Amino acid sequence: MTIYHFVGIKGSGMSALAQILHDKGFQVQGSDVDKYFFTQKALEEKQIPIMTFSADNINEGLTIIAGNAFPDTHEEIERALELGLPVIRYHKFLGQLIDGYTSIAITGSHGKTSTTGLLSHVVGAIRPTSYLIGDGTGSGTKNAQYFALEACEYQRHFLAYKPTYAIMTNIDWDHPDYFKSVDDVFNAFETLGKQVKKAVFALGDDEELRKLSLDIPIIYFGFDEENEFQAKNVIKETTGTRFDVYHRDEFLASFEIPAYGDHNVLNALSVIALCDYEGLPVEAVKKELKTFEGVKRRFSITEKGNQVLVDDYAHHPSEIRATVNAARQKYPDKKVVAVFQPHTFTRTRTFLQGFADSLNLADEVYLCDIFGSAREKTGNLTIADLAHKTKGNHIIKEEHTEELLKYPGAVILFMGAGDVQKFQAAYEKVLDNEVVTKSDFKKSAIN
């Protein structure tokens, strides 16, 4: 039996796919840079070997699954080609893997990971379901009927998939290093829609998705009355959100989610619509929606001292706005401080004013240096260009996060798609030292 070797196994999709193959009984290993990523924890728990990149890792008997970030000139891929080993790109392998299942591809400019996680949680509790989530989580469930997968639009990679269903959460202009306009993004989504076998579930409140022209049913969901599935009577509370769902103007049921913001209501509504279409019992769907704890790096909360620290993947103006609004809902009486690390120079330059406008919805704003990508390590702007447009003109360094101590009782949002987690980790150490220092002070005062 072949051994599957993943080139770039710590990538979020690659990590999830490796776990799926492992669960299905295949022998799996992989390689990556010698740096810790949160995605490797699950790999280590399943005892999947992780090596540092080296041509010496490549031997006879391997099938190479190559991450899309690595060119054919990568040393491991070059060696594999020299040896005549099968080399297949991540998205193409996944496209082959989902055949034979009732597959559900979740795509959209924003909300893919959260919606894939929610769908996997709900459907997986009702029917056997395999899933691949963009937070690095994957499961190859035995005798699975359904396969839920996050489908990324970047470089049109999702066109390798021909799923049974697709959920389209929204269309927005992102990845400006590849997509030239929102029309370019729309064309990619419509092309995917033409490959879907049974039906597309699309946000009807999105003017771009309303333009879809397909030969299969398009089931629209949203807040507007013309949608086939409509969320009404939304009640936002500090413990979550409640809402009613109407199907073709007839009451379906009332639902409750332990999540915040309109975007999470819409994510849940897409799942409700698909489950109803597939005939899954509404009471079971209601039960599972109430117990979803979220996905990694999506409004992940840590309480430290009197502050609330939130880790979030938000890296586009629309996502920052949604994250700030969610914080306002859950913590209406707290000050909101945004700590943001822009991801890629092209995105930062393209959406500079949009980033400023979204960040300024917070009470205070701190900016980290721009995180470059493997394809784009430098650019013709700096973080100062964005800082000049935001509240306070604050730039924060990893070694000086103690500035955030100025906001006792605040919610501090650490946002970005790069390595902004290291800023949160540094600040947590500052907070831990504060506790120790105060404890020592009390002891000396007593003595």
Swiss-Prot record:
Its EC number is 6.3.2.8. Its main location: cytoplasm. It is found in: Cytoplasm. It comes from the Bacteria. Pathway: Cell wall biogenesis; peptidoglycan biosynthesis. GO terms for molecular function: ATP binding; UDP-N-acetylmuramate-L-alanine ligase activity. Cell wall formation. This is UDP-N-acetylmuramate--L-alanine ligase. It comes from Listeria welshimeri serovar 6b (strain ATCC 35897 / DSM 20650 / CCUG 15529 / CIP 8149 / NCTC 11857 / SLCC 5334 / V8). The gene is murC.
